[in-house]
Amino acid sequence: MKYVIIGHGGHSKVIKDLIESREGHMIIAYLDDKYELLDTIMDVYIGPVHSIRLILNQHPDVKVVIAIGDNKTRKAIVEELNLPPEYYSPLISENAVISPSAQIDIGTVIMPGAIINAEASIGKHVIVNTGAIVDHDCRIGDYAHVSPRGCLTGDVTLQEGVLIGTGATVIPGLSIGTWSKVGAGATVVKSIPNYC
């Protein structure tokens, strides 16, 4: 499987490790607007994001991963690219624990040590970061991010774009509203409205 990585910063380093840990998987391009021109370095394309069309014309069988940690930027890039869904798939670490009854949508990345338990549902282009826990019956909206060691106990709902900070915990049955943020180390004991 060939991959194009959108974003060439810190998050892309972990994505690179996930991809290259699998036999037969390889990265053919890193696209980031910090680059002005499309070039190749050791047979890997390096260039601006708009170069994606040229690469897809030459390699129509690739998968695209948005390696951007910031939720709003990740959503903006997905909307700007406007690619058909078949170019995206979940990228799941072999060192994650995933319940067979969990549902994980396209473009979502599950990092090493993450645990996704029974009947959890995870939307599009979500990051479940290193060692995060998404327990039974949780629902995570598109473009959310559960940071390293974040913990969603049972039946928690995250709406679109929510950020759960490093080591934060949300107790059972709560809802975190659209584009809200939970700070690192927090324990959430009541639901949070949108845009907080």
Regions found by a protein language model. Give the residues of each.
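Residues at the starts of beta-strands that form the adenosine-phosphate
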Residues: 2, 26-28, 63, 87
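Glycine-rich adenosine-cofactor-binding loop
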Residues: 2-17
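Short alpha-helical
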Residues: 10, 72-73, 187
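Short amphipathic alpha-helical segments
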Residues: 16-18, 76-80, 122, 193-194
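NAD(P)-binding Rossmann-fold cofactor-contacting core
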Residues: 22-40
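Phosphate-bearing ligand-interacting subdomains
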Residues: 36-97
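Structural signal for interior beta-strand "rungs" in well-ordered beta-sheet cores
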Residues: 90-196
